[in-house]
From Swiss-Prot:
Protein name as annotated: Metallothionein-1
Residues binding a divalent metal cation 4: 33-34, 44, 48
GO MF term list: zinc ion binding
Binding sites annotated in the UniProt record for a divalent metal cation 2: 7, 13, 15, 26
Residues that, per the record, bind a divalent metal cation 3: 15, 19, 24, 29
Organism: Chlorocebus aethiops (Green monkey)
Keyword Magnesium: no
Amino acid sequence: MDPNCSCATGVSCTCADSCKCKECKCTSCKKSCCSCCPVGCAKCAQGCVCKGASEKCNCCA
């Protein structure tokens, strides 16, 4: 379980707007699930890998 999310890691779920989970594929999270992913990225919920804090993730490049 992600301490910042009320669901199992890697499982589609609904999270609050304050969701900070990175591994959880939050379907309702309005923020990017990756710090390097732009807000609103449609592919971020499919899971992405961030190479660095300032780099784009591989699914939103």
